[in-house]
Amino acid sequence: DYLIGLRKAYPYASYITINISSPNTQNLRQLQGADVLDQLLNRLKLEQTQLTQTHGKHVPLVIKIAPDLSDEAITSIANLLLKHQIDGVIATNTTITRTGVEQFSVSKEPGGLSGAPLTQQASKVLGQLHAVLNNAIPIIGVGGIMSPKDAQDKIDSGADLIQLYTGLIYHGPDFVREIVKAVCSNPVHSN
């Protein structure tokens, strides 16, 4: 499926996300295991090389990982991304944990949890990826960005870019402007 999707989207895409972390797709997260991921990344990279030649353009591949990984698994994934020269990583998808929301009846429903309960967990994964990758590939920080401060924290933890989901739903399109203004006013990131 990934190879078919890659072939179909490649001519039209600016970049392609390979999501191996959706909690809503049965058994998908098993693809984050070292042996399976190694094989998948190898096949994707070979296909990307062929498609680059066919279409005369390089479309970056970005791997989206889960926040519910052990430190060992995060390090293993980071090393595989380096080994296969993957173009970027998205840290992270939604979580299957329900820490901090156990009191709500909806917490027992299946699927991924996003928003504020995810902030710290996603930032922890981002920080660990940053430490292992050492700026070798871009990291897109996502997960629990509910304020301009959260966005700045992602950048400070090693994100090269950020993505918004739940924060955008709650705050609307002006949320993007608020974040850009806050980040640009930070002397460290004024360029």
Could you tell me what each predicted segment is?
Residues 1-2, 29-32, 36, 62-83:
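Active-site glycine- and acidic-residue-rich loops that bind
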Residues 50-69, 131-141:
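Short beta-strand/loop segments at the ligand-binding rim of alpha/beta enzyme cores
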Residues 15-17, 58-62, 87-90, 138-140, ...:
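Structural preference for beta-strand elements that scaffold enzyme active sites
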Residues 1-24:
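Internal alpha/beta core interface subdomains
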Residues 24-32, 36, 80-135, 175:
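Glycine/Thr-rich beta-alpha phosphate-binding loop at enzyme active sites
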Residues 69-83, 130-135, 145-162:
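Catalytic cores of alpha/beta
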Residues 99-111, 166-191:
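C-terminal helical cap(s) of enzyme catalytic domains, especially alpha/beta-barrels
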Residues 20, 88-98, 145, 151-178:
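Glycine-rich phosphate-binding active-site loops on the catalytic face of alpha/beta enzymes
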